[in-house]
């Protein structure tokens, strides 16, 4: 794949993001120029983000998608940086850009969206596995994370004898030294376990094939407008679709019904 400027795409992270976008976009997978891909993406996506602000893209009137690359054959923890794990994406989230909040104003705007974590294990240019897991199968309610953040912020602000500034981070302390020229930024660095570890009981990882998993709540599956006919891949033993029960991220004493797609090729 070439950039419009004729520069090569930098690294497997970019290639993984194109791969995931193409999976949702269909026809763009046959295009090699990034400007040609962009024209297709603009027909399908209402928002295309950047590496500094979630999400990476939003399907028009559909889910948000956040792409994460792990440079290992399997497993590995996932760095989320300053954004805590999300069961849903909210337009009120201070971590997203204004352009993201306004990306569907022509349809009346949005307040809450499903979010899909697309997590790829890649070495060199080989994709070992790709998870497409809905946040509400994987992450707790936002209050679970906000409570920790607010508790830490309040604790920092109670440190006596220092000067604070307003910040979106956990805190910023000014004039730390006698000259008043040093400051300290305090920021959270969130991370989450790989879904391959979280849902390992449901997996068969014996072969060296590339594996793709899609996990969603059964209630989400029922509401999907268009379900592709995957009979051909099931008959070829490439794909299985199973109803399973997974722990409720908000209360592991309860299970929730879910649908797991497993492909190996």
Label each residue range with its predicted role.
Residues 1-54, 58, 63, 69-265:
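Nucleic-acid endonuclease domains
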